[in-house]
């Protein structure tokens, strides 16, 4: 909250667009890592007790563009949330990457994905167990309906440029 106040306090016109679990067809992100691991391994252990919502760079770009289009015409909230629709665990996303990747011919056979706990996969940064963002008011303000994360994931994988 202090960071929000610091950002908004430095300008007469400021806007923060919060997002989470960003995936896209290029760069390093969870979806492309899972696609690579589905190709390389027979089995994967993926955290199943952290829930959020993947957000495609493709739909995030639409939200950013729409924000810029209407920012001068409309009174937008200073802090908005954007994510694709639905909820998923990292495990759910990994399974979906395998299924969709196989459907699209990006992998031959998906790896078997085993659910594990956060305790089974320690990381330097502590991750929240539940990190969903409510994008309802942002969707209304931007007049965008958004997309379910599985449909957005399909779009990401269709455009993926992985070796």
Where are the predicted features?
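Mid/C-terminal beta-alpha module of Rossmann-like enzyme folds, strongest
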Residues: 63, 70-124
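Residue-level signal for the nucleotide or nucleotide-sugar donor/cofactor binding architecture
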Residues: 52-55, 88, 133, 144-147
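A general structural signal for well-ordered alpha-helical segments in protein cores
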Residues: 1, 30-31, 57, 61, ...
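Glycine-rich Rossmann NAD(P)(H)-binding loop
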Residues: 46-51, 78-87, 141
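A hydrophobic C-terminal alpha-helical subdomain
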Residues: 119-144, 153
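NAD(P)-dependent short-chain dehydrogenase/reductase
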Residues: 5-52, 57-59, 65-66
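Amphipathic alpha-helical segments that line or abut small-molecule/effector binding pockets
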Residues: 58-69, 150, 154
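Amphipathic terminal alpha-helices
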Residues: 148-163
């Amino acid at each position: 909250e202090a960071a929000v106040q610091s950002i908004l306090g430095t300008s007469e016109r400021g806007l923060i667009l919060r997002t989470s679990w960003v995936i896209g067809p290029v760069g390093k992100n969870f979806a492309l890592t899972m696609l690579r691991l589905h190709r390389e391994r027979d089995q994967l252990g993926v955290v199943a007790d952290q829930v959020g919502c993947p957000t495609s760079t493709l739909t995030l770009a639409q939200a950013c563009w729409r924000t810029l289009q209407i920012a001068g015409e409309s009174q937008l909230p200073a802090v908005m949330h954007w994510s694709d629709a639905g909820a998923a665990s990292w495990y759910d996303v990994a399974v979906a990457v395998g299924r969709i990747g196989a459907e699209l011919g990006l992998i031959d056979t998906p790896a078997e994905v085993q659910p594990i706990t956060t305790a089974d996969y320690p990381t330097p940064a502590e991750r929240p167990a539940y990190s969903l963002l409510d994008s309802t008011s942002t969707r209304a303000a931007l007049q965008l309906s958004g997309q379910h994360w599985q449909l957005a994931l399909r779009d990401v994988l269709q455009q993926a440029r992985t070796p």
